[in-house]
Amino acid sequence: MRIGVVFPQVEIGQDPSAIRDYAQAVEAMGYTHVLVFDHVLGANPERPGGWKGPYTFRHTFHEPLVLFGFLAAATRRLELVTGILILPQRQAALVAKQAATVDVLSGGRLRLGVAVGWNAVEFEALGESFRTRGRRIEEQIEVMRALWTKDLVRVQGQWHSIPDAGINPLPVQRPIPVWMGGESDVVVRRAARVADGWMPHFRPGSAAQTVVDRVHGYVKEAGRAPVDFGIEGRFALSQVPAAEWAQEMAAWRGMRGITHLSVHTVGLGLPTPAAHVEMLERFKKEALG
């Protein structure tokens, strides 16, 4: 199992030196990857019609692919993971170009987690349809993979038209791994059919194992091998008392099919980026051995 960290988007602040130091410390501790959340816009909770989302315009969100360009130069081994990028509110060819550039600058260290999103405000502001986002994401992935693996691409789809054109440079990974987030059955079936992996939100245990086994069944139905399909869990330290970290970690390691895990330090009241690093050091000592 590869164990990484969740970048503390809403708590890390805006100091580039602190962000660099955080990433380098994570890499030096031996964590394998850094996973970054994505939101382009935050809504005003006092807007007409109200607001029920967990984030507002007051929460800091560094743009993941721009951030990865910075982190690519600051690190050497750390895998750079979007978890997730809200793909349908973006233009697919542009994302393919941006992702390819990150992959080149990082020496092939990008993993692109994508999902359909839930924030209609962002879709409206970015000029994309919220209603069709589920249908469009599959064609977007197909278009991006073509652009990542061919010098010239000809596409005439329902949502995309590329008249014999391509991106340059192509990425190091051809294609870049695409994982999907989301919990509904239709989303999980889509991931099993078209993605390289899935990013769920659950605690380890028998109920989670039942879900993983069901997903592996969907993968087989799609004519694919579960051994080639990754699943990344999320260990939120705010949900588990420190005295139970080792036990929870053992439960994760005991699950079949979990290939990756990200340790999440947001929500603990940590006041600085350095405090997040210290918490990850403590977790490594007490839970990873």
For the regions a protein language model found, what residue spans apply to each?
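Active-site-adjacent structural elements that line small-molecule/cofactor binding pockets in enzymes
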Residues: 1-289
